[in-house]
């Protein structure tokens, strides 16, 4: 028993466990072996808790939200009464959700064509700007999304050409989308996705999808019905 507790004090848990189990099988054991095994389990748990605390703190500082969440969930299972751990877990989950939302706007900037999506993105910028550090990737997302928002309602030239016999319509433009028959016209459109259609009696309808990027550019779309209906 003395050897077992000496090994335990030295942090040699495997050696201590083997000695306590051997003593536990002895008819002379008075319960000390069980106490020794309990202390080993407690010390091992404490070591795990300390490691999880350290690793989760590092993950939070680095803005590695998913890693922090995984570690904090393990830690919460071992320390269910810890209010601090629950608070950190909630923070990491909220910031992961915010980071994912911000990345969604950056991955699909043309979605800001929608007024509703634009307002959500603006709200995201306000909310993230008010967060205390750490912000992780959201710091760079703020800069990138701020630029996109500044361009979201800029208007860029789009030139449409046709044959003067095709009836042209720009979808997503309401009543203003009916352009009639034309040979050449210039539109000013905000960044987004558009569809232009063409109709002509006796000919197959045509349709062209195009995009206006956030930073504009030279866009020329030709739309005309040329294939006769069999």
Label each PLM-derived region with a short phrase:
Residues 2-12, 17-28, 35, 42, ...:
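Short loop/turn and low-complexity linker motifs enriched in small/turn-promoting residues
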């Amino acid at each position: 028993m003395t050897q077992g507790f000496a090994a335990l004090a030295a942090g040699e848990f495997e050696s201590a466990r083997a000695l306590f189990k051997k003593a536990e099988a002895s008819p002379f054991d008075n319960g000390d072996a069980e106490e020794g095994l309990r202390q080993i389990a407690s010390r091992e748990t404490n070591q795990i808790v300390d490691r999880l605390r350290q690793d989760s703190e590092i993950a939070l500082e680095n803005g590695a939200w998913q890693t922090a969440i995984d570690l904090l969930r393990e830690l919460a299972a071992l320390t269910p009464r810890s209010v601090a751990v629950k608070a950190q877990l909630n923070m990491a989950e909220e910031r992961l959700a915010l980071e994912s939302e911000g990345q969604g706007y950056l991955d699909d900037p043309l979605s800001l064509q929608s007024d509703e999506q634009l307002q959500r993105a603006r709200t995201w910028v306000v909310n993230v700007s008010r967060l205390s550090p750490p912000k992780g990737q959201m710091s760079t997302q703020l800069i990138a999304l701020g630029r996109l928002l500044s361009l979201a309602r800029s208007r860029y030239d789009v030139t449409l050409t046709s044959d003067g016999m095709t009836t042209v319509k720009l979808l997503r433009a309401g009543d203003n989308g009916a352009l009639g028959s034309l040979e050449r016209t210039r539109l000013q459109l905000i960044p987004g996705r558009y569809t232009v259609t063409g109709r002509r009696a006796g000919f197959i309808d045509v349709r062209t999808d195009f995009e206006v990027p956030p930073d504009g550019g030279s866009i020329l779309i030709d739309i005309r019905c040329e294939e006769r209906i069999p």
